[in-house]
């Protein structure tokens, strides 16, 4: 099964649907994203981009609220905190300070731009 994300005029993902792989096959039996996008457009209208759970296309699996960046050809999740920066390699948001790698649990504190240990 193939997955397609509908993006609005602001390049925000507004829904993701599943499409049979048969809808993507050309006359030679090769999958073509454009055929799947046309199929989705015929059914629902709008603009559609293929997405993948394994991240082999467009960096991340699209979710509602994600943004499609045409320059990076990637789906980018919503920014969780103002201080976090986008990794160009993964198109995931990363904290300005890495989370400690020890046996404790942490939550991000945006006020101090640091990790706070959580007592469990």
What are the language-model segments listed below?
Residues 1-120:
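Interaction-interface detector
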């Amino acid at each position: 099964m193939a997955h397609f994300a509908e993006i609005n005029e602001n390049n925000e993902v507004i829904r993701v649907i599943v499409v049979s792989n048969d809808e993507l096959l050309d006359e030679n039996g090769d999958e073509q994203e454009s055929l799947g996008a046309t199929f989705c457009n015929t059914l629902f209208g709008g603009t559609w981009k293929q997405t993948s759970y394994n991240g082999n296309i467009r960096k991340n699996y699209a979710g509602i609220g994600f943004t499609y960046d045409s320059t990076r050809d990637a789906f980018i999740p919503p920014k969780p905190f103002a201080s976090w920066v986008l990794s160009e390699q993964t198109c995931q948001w990363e904290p300005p300070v890495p989370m400690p790698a020890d046996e404790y649990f942490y939550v991000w504190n945006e006020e101090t731009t640091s990790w706070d240990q959580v007592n469990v």
